[in-house]
């Protein structure tokens, strides 16, 4: 357990793309991911549950694809995410996570006995999946299909269903787990329904593109740049190898980036020590002669 100052670098972005079939969720996700990776498609992976639809956009770049077939269990999604993480992916697109919810609903429908007891067995599986999304080492973009939502209203003494818009096919409160939620219409335009970054709150509907991902990446990296400057100054002030080791161990998440600066400072300190040691030997020899001791005699 550790108390630390809040830093954006500690959290990867979690984005949800909601829309009906044909709205362009996969295409929009790929363009956004391009911006997040600085144009490097090789650092993007799609976990494809939509009958290999991810391959339709291969002309965009050489991104990676994990094709998933039924059953779409939470455990298989977790396994696919871990596969992408081990391969060093920066962005993982889950296309789509609605299949996971459909799978759990089917499992629940086929369970015998009390419905609440059945959900007590299913909910932990869903929670593990959500936990994996939130704690992944990569940026996550999750697409979700939507369906018409209804409410029952009383009219003339009768309960009549009324349309109240579209609803994502997933657990009701799942959108709370994401940093940004985009609703995409049939014209492929996005509207933000949740935005904890504040980047898109006041924007009208727009087409998602690489610049969208660039904005989000800049927001994520803003604090990192400031932190790097502070650490570089801290390294420059080190006067011993022990102090340098201490600085290096303080920032485990940045060690890969800090290594070249640390090694350069290490060489500088070692050179300084090598110059000091001969001078120290001369001083010791002078003292020995004054005491009537000469090592050359």
Please give the residue ranges for each predicted region.
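Interfaces that engage single-stranded nucleic acids at replication/repair/recombination sites
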Residues: 1-19, 23, 34, 51-56, ...
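Phosphate-binding/switch region of NTP-binding enzymes
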Residues: 20, 131-214
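Hydrophobic positions on the alpha1 helix immediately C-terminal to the Walker A/P-loop
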Residues: 28
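Conserved P-loop NTPase nucleotide-binding/switch module
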Residues: 94-124, 152, 159
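Intein modules and their embedded homing endonuclease domains
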Residues: 15, 36, 43, 54, ...
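Residue-level preference for the first positions of well-ordered beta-strands
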Residues: 14-16, 43, 90-93, 139-141
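Nucleotide-state-sensitive switch-loop elements of NTP-binding domains
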Residues: 39-90
């Amino acid at each position: 357990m550790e108390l630390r100052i809040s830093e954006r670098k500690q959290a990867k972005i979690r984005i949800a793309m909601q829309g009906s079939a044909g709205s362009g969720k996969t295409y929009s996700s790929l363009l956004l991911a391009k911006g997040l990776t600085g144009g490097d498609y090789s650092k993007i992976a799609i976990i494809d549950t939509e009958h290999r639809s991810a391959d339709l956009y291969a002309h965009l770049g050489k991104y990676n694809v994990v094709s998933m077939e039924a059953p779409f269990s939470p455990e298989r999604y977790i396994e696919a995410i871990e596969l992408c993480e081990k391969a060093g992916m920066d962005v993982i697109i889950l296309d789509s996570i609605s299949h996971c919810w459909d799978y759990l609903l089917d499992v629940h429908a086929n369970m015998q006995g009390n419905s609440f007891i059945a959900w007590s067995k299913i909910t932990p599986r869903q929670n593990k999946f959500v936990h994996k999304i939130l704690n992944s080492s990569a940026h996550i973009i999750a697409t979700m299909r939507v369906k018409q939502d209804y409410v029952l209203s009383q009219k003339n003494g009768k309960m009549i269903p009324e349309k109240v818009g579209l609803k994502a096919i997933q657990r009701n409160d799942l959108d709370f787990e994401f940093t940004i939620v985009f609703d995409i219409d049939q014209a492929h335009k996005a509207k933000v329904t949740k935005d904890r970054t504040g980047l898109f709150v006041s924007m009208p509907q727009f087409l998602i593109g690489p610049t969208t991902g660039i904005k989000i990446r800049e927001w994520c990296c803003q604090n990192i740049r400031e932190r790097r400057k502070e650490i570089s100054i801290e390294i420059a002030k080190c006067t011993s190898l022990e102090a340098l080791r201490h600085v290096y161990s303080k920032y485990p998440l940045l060690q890969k980036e800090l290594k070249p600066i640390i090694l350069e400072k290490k060489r500088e300190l070692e050179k300084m020590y090598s110059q000091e040691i001969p001078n120290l030997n001369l001083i010791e020899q002078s003292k020995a002669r004054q005491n009537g001791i000469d090592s050359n005699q």
